[in-house]
């Protein structure tokens, strides 16, 4: 395993292969990691087409430093920006899965000149309030008292702190327009029971650019 060491001396695990540009960076989803099938298939595509490729684990995920509940959207945004700044050269295509789609948009806002294009795979943004609203009244009281709760969703469970919800709202993408003229593709499954089918349209409506495609899959 290869690691990038950040300014706090924390390890960010990543995999990389060399190739021509524009490079590809894959960003995983919430409570996921770079070991998923999407990352593997995209890596295979990059190798076949001689494109540089990087996938990584955000802090608190996979092989990277720390526990999941100790980090926020701002931390993970910092991770992808570190990957772009320290491990890549030239234009990059960001591919974000689920929450990774939110992070790719935040990274594009922070480093617009480094982005060649964006591809969202069931990309979802601004979900802090939705997560909070799904918490039971009992657990909201526990969260208020202790600052942390065990969150269960679609067969998975993980811990979330009060700071996660507050920070997520500070990073909401849909609050203002984003001037982005590079190609963007948003791919969404019509039977997705996690990401709302209208999410790609909501994202598209906040982009000041015409080079946007929304692709719906029947699955």
Where are these predicted regions, by residue range?
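N-terminal cap/lid segment of alpha/beta-hydrolase-fold proteins
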Residues: 1-18
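Short glycine-enriched nucleophile-adjacent loop
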Residues: 101-112, 118
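Hydrolase active-site cap/lid region
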Residues: 113-160
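Catalytic histidine neighborhood in serine/cysteine hydrolases
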Residues: 207-219
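Alpha/beta-hydrolase active-site loop
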Residues: 70-87
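Conserved alpha/beta-hydrolase
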Residues: 39, 43-65
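Short beta-strand/loop motif that positions the catalytic acidic residue
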Residues: 180, 186-188, 192
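Short alpha-helix in the alpha/beta-hydrolase fold that links the catalytic acid
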Residues: 39, 182, 196-205
């Amino acid at each position: 395993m290869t690691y990038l060491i950040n300014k706090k001396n924390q390890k960010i695990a990543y995999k990389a292969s060399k190739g021509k540009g524009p490079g590809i960076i894959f960003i995983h989803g919430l409570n996921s990691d770079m070991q998923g099938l999407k990352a593997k298939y995209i890596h295979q595509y990059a190798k076949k087409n001689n494109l540089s490729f990087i996938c990584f684990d955000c802090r608190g995920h996979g092989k990277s430093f720390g526990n999941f509940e100790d980090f926020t959207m701002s931390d993970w945004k910092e991770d992808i920006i570190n990957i772009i700044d320290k491990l890549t050269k030239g234009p990059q295509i960001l591919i974000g899965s689920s929450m990774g789609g939110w992070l790719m948009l935040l990274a594009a806002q922070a480093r617009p000149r480094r982005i060649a294009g964006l591809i969202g795979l069931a990309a979802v943004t601004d979900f802090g309030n939705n997560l909070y609203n799904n918490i039971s009244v009992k657990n909201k009281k526990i969260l208020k008292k202790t600052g942390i709760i065990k969150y269960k969703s679609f067969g998975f469970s993980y811990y979330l702190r009060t700071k996660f919800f507050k920070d997520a709202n500070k990073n909401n993408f849909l609050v203002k327009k984003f001037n982005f003229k590079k190609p963007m593709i948003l791919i969404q499954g019509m039977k997705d029971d996690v990401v709302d089918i209208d999410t790609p349209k909501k994202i598209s409506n906040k982009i000041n650019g015409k080079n946007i495609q929304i692709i719906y899959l029947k699955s």
